[in-house]
Amino acid sequence: MIQAGDFRKGTTFEMDGDVWQIIDFQHVKPGKGAAFVRTKIRSVMTGSNRDMTFNPNEKYEEARIETREMQYLYNDGTLYYFMDPDSYEQLPIDKASVEEAILYIKENDMATIKFFKGKAFQVSPPNFVELEITQTEPGIKGNTATGATKPATVETGATVNVPLFVNEGDKIKIDTRTGEYLSRV
């Protein structure tokens, strides 16, 4: 059991026959009245979001989430296929569960997949990835005195702001949590 006062970002719990994940939370202690926890939660099963307030003393059953590393194989337009590297079992995952993580995952890359009762509900790329730039404007020398950036499209289709000295064909390192350029590889 977990108390609402112990909610943190990423916490998963069961409520009303569904599994919910905390997206954002705020502990509120007003001058008058009782304290409460204001949250934004997402249904693990349906993907719908809700804003809820909880009494910090309310208790909920903590959801048991399984995490596995799997290899991304391909997509057929509607489903994304991942493979367990130990058993070679292939797992199709719908587009809603993959969300924006696929912008940082190439074919044959590893990804972290979260499961609840055998159903995949979230795909996460590694924290840092190296991708090749497929399209960007050429940087013009003398354009600026400070570190200016320009948009660049990488091989997976994601758009990243990069420094002016980065060109097409360069490999760059990206922080997938923020989507920011880190360095040239």
From Swiss-Prot:
Q: Where in the cell is it found?
A: Cytoplasm
The terms under GO molecular function for this entry are: translation elongation factor activity
User: What PANTHER family does this protein map onto?
Assistant: ELONGATION FACTOR P, ELONGATION FACTOR P (EF-P) FAMILY PROTEIN
The protein's job, in short, is:
Involved in peptide bond synthesis. Stimulates efficient translation and peptide-bond synthesis on native or reconstituted 70S ribosomes in vitro. Probably functions indirectly by altering the affinity of the ribosome for aminoacyl-tRNA, thus increasing their reactivity as acceptors for peptidyl transferase.
UniProt keyword annotations, A-Z? Cytoplasm, Elongation factor, Protein biosynthesis
* Superkingdom field: Bacteria
One GO cellular component term noted in the UniProt record for this chain: cytoplasm
Please tell me whether the keyword Lipid biosynthesis is annotated for this protein: no
Q: Which SMART domains match?
A: EFP, Elong-fact-P_C
Q: Which HAMAP family match?
A: EF_P
Which PROSITE patterns does the UniProt entry name for this protein?
Answer: EFP
GO terms for biological process?
Answer: peptide biosynthetic process
Write down the NCBIfam families for this protein, in alphabetical order.
Answer: efp, PRK00529.1
For this protein, the record's Pfam families field holds:
EFP, EFP_N, Elong-fact-P_C
Cross-referenced InterPro entries: Elong-fact-P_C, NA-bd_OB-fold, Rib_uL2_dom2, Transl_elong_fac_P/YeiP, Transl_elong_KOW-like, Transl_elong_P/YeiP_cen, Transl_elong_P/YeiP_CS, Transl_elongation_fac_P
Pathways per UniProt: Protein biosynthesis; polypeptide chain elongation
Listed name of the protein = Elongation factor P
Family to which the UniProt record says this protein belongs:
Belongs to the elongation factor P family.
